Amino acid sequence: MTQLQSLRGMVDLLPEQTRCWQAVESVARDHFRRAGLQEIRTPLLEVTELFARGIGEATDVVGKEMYTFVDRGDRSCTLRPEGTASVVRAALQHGLLSQGPQRLWYGGPMFRYERPQAGRQRQFYQIGVEYLGVGSPRSDAEVIALAWALLVDLGVQGLVLEINSLGTLQDRQKYREELVAWLEARSDQLDDDSRKRLYTNPLRILDSKNPAISELLQDAPTLFEALSVESKARFEEVQVDLEALQIPFQLNPRLVRGLDYYGHTAFEITSDQLGAQATVCGGGRYDGLVEQLGGAPTPAFGWAFGMERLMLLLESAASINPNGSAARLTASTRPDLYVVNRGEQAERVALVIAHQLRAAGLVVELDSSGSAFNKQFKRAGRSRATWALVIGDDEAERGEARLKYLQEATTQANPIPIDQLHRLDDVTGLVRLVRE
């Protein structure tokens, strides 16, 4: 019988990887808590119209990449390709915006039918932040600073913050006309992809990965030149606030985001450690999205980072600096104690002891194999536990267990009284019992 495999681009996270992800998520949760954010969780499956209206029908995401099907109720449904539209839909549906500004964060899997490669899968995980109902330029800088501080705290190397202003809808319409006219005069130099986008989504040509197109665009008019006086002044305020926060940034007049709802400030944080997939975090202002989805005009700003790319960066950083924060985050979680036991009476005693020590807060791995002691000790070594608690029928009869330090092969196992183990709340207590 053929062995079943996961779908292409749908990757399993094995226990060691999951522990690393949990460590990163814990750091993110702490940053969000200190910034006063609240978590929101939305369904994986939404009506297709949400993304068609929110993201834009002319985008690659809606046109090429979504997982869409018609369900048994004859409704067109889509696995969410990003998180922002779902968060805004939930805020509208449940009246959150009537309660004042909302500072929300989310995390979970998204789905896009793309060509899988390192750091980019068809099921991918994002952690994102959405500030709804907050419209000042200062809030742009605040939310960007939250992303920057988190990535720095995680130990990511080679970070570069790029910012741009996409202006208002009127600014973009004016620029679109100028850009289309400029590109039409050079249509013979465009590749097939750029020709397709010329009249549907010309701003996306600015983000072309074709080196020839990138070189051609060096002489193209920039969006900044088309911005109104008000849009330029607003963008200047964002830059002043980032400077006040001592966050280095670069202006990138070619920076556009792949979703139609962005306007005014847009940003990306890249790393020189990622190669072609350099962007680790991106976002911006999307003041028109709430209204597009049926709500009142509401300012909003948000960002998201992809966990897969972030983990690639942390693994790279850990290899560069084995003592840094990234190395600590990507290290496997070690059990405090591995319980080695054999014999009918010993196994029951070991079960009770493991339960008591876990309740006291220790990380305890119990060997339930019933195999020979030497095999159990080999497994204890592979677990990377610091200590082994050894119980045989003889020890159980005497009311003792033996504690062995696993980091030195020659260390003797020292007896400790079983009836004292319930007092323990950390491994230091184990060592203290041995000395007593």
UniProtKB/Swiss-Prot annotation:
GO molecular function, one term: histidine-tRNA ligase activity
Record's keyword annotation contains Aminoacyl-tRNA synthetase: yes
Keywords of the record: Aminoacyl-tRNA synthetase, ATP-binding, Cytoplasm, Ligase, Nucleotide-binding, Protein biosynthesis
Catalytic reaction list: tRNA(His) + L-histidine + ATP = L-histidyl-tRNA(His) + AMP + diphosphate + H(+)
Keyword check for Glycoprotein: no
A biological process from GO: histidyl-tRNA aminoacylation
EC nos: 6.1.1.21
GO cellular component assignments: cytoplasm
Domain of life: Bacteria
Assembly and oligomerization: Homodimer.
UniProt family annotation: Belongs to the class-II aminoacyl-tRNA synthetase family.
The protein's name in its UniProt record: Histidine--tRNA ligase
